[in-house]
């Protein structure tokens, strides 16, 4: 004869909050999080933070133009001056479009393609050995994650535009 074993209830995070702080406290926490996530100010901050690797790099290459040219030459990108100019334009204009939420799809697309191209051009871990290969591999995987984030920001921007 089989013994009946009751199924355990899986507690969601919100259920655990309710048990710990009482029902009303859980609702307050949930409402606070919803308010925060719906905040236009937080959205702008998130866009600025998301684009920081791009606008930070673009500004650094603009401020220290010769350093940017040297970086391009180091990675074998010739003519280094033109690659530096193209990088600055792509990084700063793509970031601006995303941060300002204007043609976000274009800014995210430009930065996504730019980021994808850096993998075979600069972070080609399959051609390297030892520690350099490991660093390039991890950089490449981080770049793939960034590309995913850029796709998400474009999707969310388009949804918001459609909803008005």
Residue ranges and their predicted role:
Residues 2-63, 81-164:
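Extended, low-polarity transmembrane helix blocks
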């Amino acid at each position: 004869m089989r013994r009946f074993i009751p199924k355990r209830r899986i507690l969601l995070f919100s259920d655990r909050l309710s048990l710990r702080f009482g029902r009303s406290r859980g609702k307050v926490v949930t409402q606070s999080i919803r308010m925060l996530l719906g905040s236009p100010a937080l959205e702008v901050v998130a866009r600025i933070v998301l684009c920081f690797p791009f606008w930070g790099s673009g500004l650094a290459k603009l401020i220290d133009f010769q350093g940017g040219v040297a970086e391009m030459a180091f990675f074998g990108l010739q003519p280094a001056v033109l690659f530096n100019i193209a990088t600055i334009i792509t990084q700063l204009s793509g970031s601006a479009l995303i941060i300002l939420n204007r043609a976000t799809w274009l800014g995210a697309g430009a930065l996504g393609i730019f980021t994808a191209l850096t993998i075979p051009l600069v972070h080609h871990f399959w051609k390297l050995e030892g520690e350099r290969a490991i660093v390039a591999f991890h950089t490449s995987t981080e770049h793939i994650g960034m590309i995913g984030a850029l796709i998400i920001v474009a999707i969310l921007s388009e949804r918001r535009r459609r909803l008005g």
